[in-house]
Amino acid sequence: MCSLPRSRQTGPPIELPHNSTLLWASNLRRTREAGMGLFSRRLVPFEVTICGIDELGLHCEGRVTHVLSILDPGWPEPEALSAFDPHQRLELRFHDVIEAGAGWMAPQQQDVEHLLAFGRDLAGEKEPHLLVHCHAGVSRSTAAATLILTQARPGRPAEEALLTVVRRRPRAWPNLRIIELGDALLGRRGEIVEAARAHYRRVLEREPWLIDQMIEGGRGREVAEAGKLS
């Protein structure tokens, strides 16, 4: 039987969902039941799911073949993963920050190299289904999914990949440091960064109250990229 373990947050506030866990779980169940929980194969050559720790139990019967886990350093392995069918898993450990600082481990180039290699490997599998999760499915996981989708369709605009992620995770706020590292590694010459910048701008124009929260949470550079610093 799948379960929904409770998670704790040790990083900056961006990873916390703005809706309750129960609401997120309820919405996710409805989208899965409607057959809308997976990205269209017109956009990517494999199935992709994005979620937070509290939602992992909803996917243990989803025939997931690959799991990308992005966790805070020292965080225990999510118990819900033990209920999944046998799968390949990559675990990365860093905080949801965009600048290195005392007590915080920022994502490094090697981390992004690993997640991109994981994405390339699964693309060669037969009918792969990738699940990407971080703590809330908001920042680290959406950045990783954006890069993997961009890599999977090199001839398509990076913005298309990001918008696909946003349609699946409307509260997405991709971690800028991960995006910048991936943009450079994929040789996209700022295209993915620009897509993220445009997304930040749309979110902050719609919800300007987030500006102070982002700045207080150490994410002021993302606000600046959106052109919203006063």
Regions found by a protein language model. Give the residues of each.
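Helix-loop module immediately N-terminal to the HCX5R catalytic loop
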Residues: R93-L130
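Intrinsic-disorder-associated, low-complexity terminal segments enriched in Asp/Asn/His/Tyr and depleted
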Residues: H18-N19, N27
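Catalytic cysteine-centered active loop of the rhodanese-like fold, especially the PTP/DSP P-loop
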Residues: L122-A152
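PTP/DSP superfamily signal
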Residues: A123-E127, T150-S230
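Glycine-rich, flexible N-terminal cofactor/catalytic loop recognition
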Residues: G37-A83
